[in-house]
């Protein structure tokens, strides 16, 4: 079965064939697009990942439990609320497919969660911590999702692109959840390890999720991309196991359209 990452690469390759003039470095390094996450990557790390490593080596880079746990919450959200998901189909590219009704969503995804292979011992401990909060966080996510109030058909992972000023390659990303008028960018926050106690043990505490939290500026940039690419009302839903915050133009100046548009120039520095 083709992975989401491989499906995205195939769809992007098809999109790139429509660009008639590409510089030599694009062919040399096999770079065919930028992504919203790349816009938040430092130059040295970007150079290492996209100029030094091959595409196959990038795919083998380890992720961490917090990232994987966030993916699992997204998967649960798709099964719980989604009507359609965009997946790659050979010969057709990305195709809109119905999401069949699913019972016992949490039980289904916990199987995937338990198959995760930790990168090291610290990551294993973090994954065990995440497991304890997974159901609680999913409950908070459902409350936040319902507050947004998406209506009609809800689509998941639709691929959208944006040509940035002075850039020869498109920026491409996939929308977490959307209806005809608005979208949700989901961010999950997991307990973080505190400084070790005198006896060498450590506790784990919940991070802040109020405006300006750690990672706020990076997430704003991603929301700005999806806003500019879709023209839909943005909602940034940030969740941890004891609560959630929903940010949009009604309660956050940073997410007003005029302010998101100001991030366009910053976005193109990739």
Q: Where are the model-predicted features located?
A:
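Metal-dependent nuclease catalytic cores that hydrolyze phosphodiester bonds in DNA/RNA
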Residues: 1-174
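Mg2+/Mn2+-dependent nuclease catalytic core
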Residues: 153-269
């Amino acid at each position: 079965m083709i992975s989401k990452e491989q499906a995205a690469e195939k769809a992007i390759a098809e999109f790139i064939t429509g660009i008639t003039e590409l510089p030599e470095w694009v062919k040399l390094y096999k770079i065919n697009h930028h992504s919203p996450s790349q816009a938040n990557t430092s130059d040295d790390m970007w150079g290492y990942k996209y100029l030094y490593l091959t595409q196959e080596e990038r795919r083998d880079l380890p992720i961490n439990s917090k990232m994987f746990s966030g993916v699992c919450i997204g998967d649960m959200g798709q099964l719980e609320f989604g009507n359609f998901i965009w997946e790659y189909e050979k010969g057709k590219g990305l195709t809109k497919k119905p999401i069949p009704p699913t019972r016992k969503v949490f039980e289904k995804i916990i199987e995937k969660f338990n198959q995760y292979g930790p990168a090291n011992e610290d990551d294993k401990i973090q994954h065990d911590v995440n497991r304890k909060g997974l159901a609680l966080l999913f409950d908070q996510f459902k409350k936040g999702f319902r507050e947004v109030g998406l209506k009609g058909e809800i689509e998941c992972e639709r691929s959208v692109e944006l040509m940035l000023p002075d850039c020869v390659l498109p920026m491409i990303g996939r929308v977490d959840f959307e209806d005809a008028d608005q979208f949700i960018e989901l961010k999950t926050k997991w307990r973080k390890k505190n400084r070790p106690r005198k006896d060498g043990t450590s506790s784990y505490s919940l991070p802040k999720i109020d405006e300006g939290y750690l990672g706020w500026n990076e997430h704003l940039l991603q929301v700005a991309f999806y806003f500019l690419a879709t023209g839909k009302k943005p909602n940034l839903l940030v969740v941890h196991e004891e609560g959630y915050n929903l940010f949009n133009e009604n309660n956050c100046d940073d997410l007003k359209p005029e302010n998101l548009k100001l991030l366009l120039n910053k976005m193109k520095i990739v």
